[in-house]
């Protein structure tokens, strides 16, 4: 295992009765609050009114930025940064899922730059060391942005979707009430669940470097929780235990605890970011389409043991006398989870995607060094995987 430093100062308020602590958390940073949210679901489910009452009822001034996109645009983040500069915002309150929190982080970083433009930070790979404080109220278990140091911002003019990171982007506090996810559409629940699953699988578990058993088994536990509880949440949207397990799995998957001593790889995430950048598809759905095809493509005698273990420890498959056969069964289990259990469309072509941009997408994600992971990939490999998904 590798040396590591674990640092996560995010304070999590988890459960049904934690929103009473929201005003106090915000007041730690000031009285001028920018509320950031998406398409209006928080107004329909009543959460918006609760938040506004809590903020204004405790003497704070509230400003708003609504309409954050599922793949948040740099232009939207820049609008928020302009509000922060004009209104001298003290703290940003993100209420929503990962896209909303990501956008809030982009705003937080851009607001402290001279020009208020997030894209130079993103495109130049700047590690953010100063940003406005962000407090998150989570409504969708998916990206893990509520407890990590990253955000992903899209530039639809250049067909780029790129991560921006920095310790300053870790939320100061996160409020996680599983009840806030009760009204999520089944499709969003399914896509979010696969995003969580793939965060672990893609980032660490099959990164290509062994870790120590405790961390490996923690990774497996998070993936097992997703496999176990997502069908329950889909069948019973107001099942608190199911929603709670998924919400905490979301936070655990990317808060750095599961990458202790490992390397980061993210082959599927890199490939999917290209799909989202060009075609604006839902991130978790793109991952669901890519993951079983990627596993099939990289399967050989060397990669088979790790993939076989996935089937046995996460999906409960019987031990196989032949690891290649066991790995094939594991891949089938992943595929069945994505397309049968979650009900996600397995074909890119059915989403209106053809191979027109595959070469450009592959060249961008591979860069000069290719994609690392359980098996390294070059441009031709990535194009082939995309074609397998049509």
Predicted features and spans:
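ATP/NTP phosphate-donor binding region
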Residues: 1-91, 348
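A glycine/threonine-rich phosphate-anchoring loop and its flanking beta-alpha core
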Residues: 10, 112-211, 305-309
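Short Gly/Thr/Asp-enriched flexible loops that form oxyanion-binding sites at enzyme active sites
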Residues: 50-51, 79-81, 100-114, 147-148
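Glycine/serine-rich anion-binding loops at beta->alpha junctions
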Residues: 89-105, 139-145, 278-281
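Short alpha-helical scaffolding segments that buttress acidic/His motifs in well-ordered protein cores
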Residues: 197-201, 243-254, 291, 334, ...
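Active-site segments that bind and position negatively charged phosphate/pyrophosphate groups
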Residues: 207-333
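C-terminal charged capping/lid subdomain of soluble metabolic enzymes
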Residues: 307, 314-390
